């Protein structure tokens, strides 16, 4: 998806904002201090990702990528129409799929393997390359069979 929309820098970092806007999406920050992350789709090419006030920019990037996963996998792919809402925080197959989508989108395999070699498996340094949390980088590395 990221390659199709030409969102990657030379290092492999995804320009999530570019993808979001090209798809007709937008982000709103909740006025509630501890509101949960969610996606509201009004129709194809018209959706809103809701993020709380108190999360880090790296968490927000993963949330946006996660909600894009719902948009592609659970709205566009099954050819849904009309309004639909997806909430984050549940433990089910759709949430797992959205997390995997986000991980692949933010840390594409080839670029991730290059960064892993360049940084000797240092998850903190690899996380910096992709602007994700060290734990997200470590999980991606484990899935790819890479070690620190």
Report each predicted region and the residues it spans.
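Active-site hotspot residues in diverse enzymes, especially metal/ion-binding acidic/histidine motifs
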Residues: 1-148
């Amino acid at each position: 998806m990221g390659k199709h929309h030409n969102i990657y820098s030379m290092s492999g970092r995804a320009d999530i904002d570019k993808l979001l806007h090209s798809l007709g999406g937008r982000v709103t920050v909740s006025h509630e201090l501890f509101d949960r992350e969610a996606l509201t789709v009004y129709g194809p090419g018209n959706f809103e990702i809701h993020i709380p006030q108190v999360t880090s920019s790296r968490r927000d990037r993963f949330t946006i990528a996660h909600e894009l996963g719902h948009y592609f996998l659970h709205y566009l792919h099954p050819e849904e129409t009309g309004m639909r809402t997806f909430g984050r925080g549940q433990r089910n197959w759709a949430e797992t799929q959205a997390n995997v989508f986000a991980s692949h989108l933010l840390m594409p395999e080839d670029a991730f393997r290059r960064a892993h070699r360049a940084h000797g498996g240092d998850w903190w340094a690899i996380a910096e390359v992709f602007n994700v949390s060290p734990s997200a980088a470590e999980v991606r590395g484990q899935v790819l069979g890479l070690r620190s």
